[in-house]
Amino acid sequence: MAKASFERTKPHVNIGTIGHVDHGKTTLTAAITKVLADQYPDLNEARAFDQVDNAPEEKERGITINVSHVEYQTEKRHYAHVDAPGHADYVKNMITGAAQMDGAILVVAATDGPMPQTREHVLLARQVGVPYIVVALNKSDMVDDEELLELVEFEVRDLLSSQDFDGDNAPVIPVSALKALEGDEKWVKSVQDLMAAVDDNVPEPERDVDKPFLMPVEDVFTITGRGTVVTGRVERGVLLPNDEIEIVGIKEKSSKTTVTAIEMFRKTLPDARAGENVGLLLRGTKREDVERGQVIVKPGSITPHTKFEAQVYILSKDEGGRHNPFYSNYRPQFYFRTTDVTGVITLPEGTEMVMPGDNTDMSVELIQPIAMEDRLRFAIREGGRTVGAGRVTKITA
């Protein structure tokens, strides 16, 4: 059977379920696939609860995470949906970015209201830049008291507002994932309403090719008689021959030059696009002017920095991480895109030390500048071994 080609006709959106353990994230994920498979049978196939629940292990930057990926379509959009069953998996997934979310469905049990993990997930969602949250008040079939439902809704809106989400206007949809799976009409409709709210409210993400050009430098070499070539995988944007570019990071000063040719496997290309591995021939650039770890960018689109705040997950001993805690002034390497840079860590006030398996905020000062922007991901390494992973939450200098 021929492999089905990926239809590019619809906007593609990455979404995930977040919320407290046992509030029904995985059941809701299964219910969405079933309801949509019944509603649009030619577009979808249902996934049973246990197909979502036994999430396969994935390695992301050396960290093992259990994450389930399902896909489904509404009339308007194609969705890729991630569900991390365990709380620790969810935290790791958010911070290491095994799955980038364009929006999230926050699952809150109407019988419980927001719980500690609900708060932590919403906080993390804000820190890692999830743009929009739609709320599913699950298990609503078990709450007869209308006032109680309203109270839970109020608490959830309050929680969203406290983390700078639009709590006043976020859609809050009472659902029953279990009843929807059982085919109860009222609750099947509730899941359809939920997906309509996701369609209408989660903003369509900007495609990578539409963003300003950025390519991390992986290798640099000289072609006699032609000049210096840098190779790497284009992270975003499109570059044309004779475009001006800027080389940013590692060195004190950024430099500008022109790309005279773009090549892939020794063939000349008309352009370089997001996702492609290419070689760029740089005009008048010496081999020693460029090095791995720098980035080739659209001029002025990104700046080099040495100081930032971050949210970090530290690997546990079982995950191959450190065996003992670390304190402020710890000096590991920070691996950004293609290279390691040493940095000094300052822990937040009130945090004396960080244990393996913890997640924490920290401030970092690097010894060399890195082309940096909010939410940029990095690994923390000691002698080439990954001991943590994090994201930039704020650039400070």
From Swiss-Prot:
Q: What is its EC number?
A: 3.6.5.3
What segment(s) does the record annotate as region G3?
83-86
Q: Which GO terms describe its cellular component?
A: cytosol
Q: Where is this region: G1?
A: 19-26
Q: Where is this region: G5?
A: 176-178
Question: Region annotation G2: residue ranges?
Answer: 62-66
Localisation: Cytoplasm
Task: Identify the stretch(es) annotated as G4.
Answer: 138-141
What one GO molecular function would you report for this record? translation elongation factor activity
Q: Where, in this chain's numbering, is GTP bound? A: 19-26, 83-87, 138-141
HAMAP family, A to Z: EF_Tu_B
Concerning its family, UniProt says: Belongs to the TRAFAC class translation factor GTPase superfamily. Classic translation factor GTPase family. EF-Tu/EF-1A subfamily.
Indicate the quaternary assembly. Monomer.
Protein name (Swiss-Prot/TrEMBL): Elongation factor Tu
Organism source for this protein?
Answer: Brevibacterium linens
